[in-house]
């Protein structure tokens, strides 16, 4: 590592990814068990399961990536491991971004009240569109990540062969052009679902806030559980949106190669990218009693085991 601070940030990122693994694993376990018991696979469960699975594998991949950087840094950057890891990282990030957007759209369509004909039509047919959401997300994520592998592999091969004086500048210019194209392609892969999520979240917050104000005007002075639930929903959506935007900005900075590899600035972005998916999984858990109950049981069991060994 280039500095002690970068090493410290890498350790923090690994810890955050482990927390994310625990959170997303909890969500997948609870949702899958619920579907098996009820023998009903709801639209919400499908979206949440695929979102949590994508983030589970993303953070597992990030942990492996961080460990290789920490212990095998020279071979990691000199060989094709870097290309493979970054390509899979882009695919999993794009996939999780898409399903986070679909979850926000689902909340918006199901919870918010609209008068527009398209949104009313979408509200009635959201369940039948779930398979198309899965296919679209998979194809789009694959399409935006695969060219990076091809071009990066070719660029790596070109740089390992001798360059003559007549064509060296041409190759470097071509590589820079290809790199710019890849950066734009990767950014589009996460920008489109981000626009969907921001737009649907704003609509949802606006609808919930309007409904909250109406209930406050009709309140009798006693604590209304429905009103508290609405305020909690607004906080949940806003927290989810804030984490998503923060993750988007940090990821764009990493993919755009804005900072020198292993610099202090990039290390901070890595910590943010590892923290935001874990934070979003915690937001989902604490907003859902089913998820919260299982996580509390797991933490209680772990705490009991630690106390038993220490005593």
Swiss-Prot record:
GO terms for biological process: calcium ion import into cytosol; cellular response to chloramphenicol; cellular response to chloroquine; cellular response to diphenidol; cellular response to nicotine; cellular response to toxic substance; cellular response to xenobiotic stimulus; detection of chemical stimulus involved in sensory perception of bitter taste. Keywords: Cell membrane, G-protein coupled receptor, Membrane, Receptor, Sensory transduction, Taste, Transducer, Transmembrane, Transmembrane helix. GO terms for molecular function: bitter taste receptor activity; G protein-coupled receptor activity. Pfam families: TAS2R. InterPro entries: TAS2R. Residues 1-9, 77-87, 150-178, 257-266 are extracellular. Expressed in the oral cavity, as well as in the gastrointestinal tract, including in the upper palate, tongue, proventriculus, ventriculus, duodenum, jejunum, ileum, cecum and colon. Its main location: membrane. Residues 31-55, 109-128, 200-235, 288-311 are cytoplasmic. It is found in: Cell membrane. The chain crosses the membrane at residues 10-30, 56-76, 88-108, 129-149, 179-199, 236-256, 267-287. One of its GO terms (cellular component) is membrane. It comes from the Eukaryota. It is a multi-pass membrane protein. Bitter taste receptor. Binds quinine, dextromethorphan, diphenhydramine, diphenidol, chlorpheniramine, diphenidol, chloramphenicol, chloroquine and coumarin, this latter being a weak agonist, as well as epiquinidine, ethylhydrocupreine and quinidine. Belongs to the G-protein coupled receptor T2R family. This is Taste receptor type 2 member 40. The gene is TAS2R40.
């Amino acid at each position: 590592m280039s500095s002690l601070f970068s090493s410290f940030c890498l350790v923090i990122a690994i810890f955050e990814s482990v927390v994310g693994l625990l959170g997303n694993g909890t969500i997948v376990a609870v949702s899958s068990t619920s579907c098996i018991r009820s023998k009903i696979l709801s639209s919400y469960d499908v979206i949440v399961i695929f979102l949590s699975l994508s983030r589970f594998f993303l953070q597992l991949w990030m942990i492996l990536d961080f460990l290789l950087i920490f212990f095998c840094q020279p071979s990691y950057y000199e060989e094709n491991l870097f290309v493979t890891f970054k390509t899979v990282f882009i695919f999993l990030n794009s996939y999780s971004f898409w399903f986070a957007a679909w979850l926000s759209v689902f909340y918006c369509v199901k919870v918010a009240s609209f008068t527009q004909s398209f949104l009313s039509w979408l509200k009635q047919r959201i369940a039948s569109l779930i398979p198309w959401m899965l296919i679209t997300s998979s194809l789009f994520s694959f399409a935006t990540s695969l060219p990076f592998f091809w071009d990066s592999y070719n660029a790596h091969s070109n740089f390992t062969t001798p360059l003559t004086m007549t064509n060296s500048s041409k190759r470097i210019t071509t590589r820079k052009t290809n790199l710019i194209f890849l950066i734009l392609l990767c950014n589009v892969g996460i920008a489109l679902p981000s626009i969907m999520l921001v737009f649907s979240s704003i609509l949802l917050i606006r609808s919930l806030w309007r409904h909250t104000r109406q209930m406050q005007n009709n309140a009798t002075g006693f604590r209304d559980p429905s009103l508290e639930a609405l305020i909690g929903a607004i906080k949940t959506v806003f927290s989810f949106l804030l984490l998503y935007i923060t993750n988007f900005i940090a990821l764009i900075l990493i993919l755009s190669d804005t900072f020198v590899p292993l610099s202090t600035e990039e290390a901070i972005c890595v910590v943010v990218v590892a923290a935001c998916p874990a934070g979003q999984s915690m937001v989902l858990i604490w907003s859902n009693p089913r998820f919260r109950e299982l996580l509390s049981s797991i933490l209680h069991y772990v705490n009991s085991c630690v106390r038993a060994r220490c005593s």
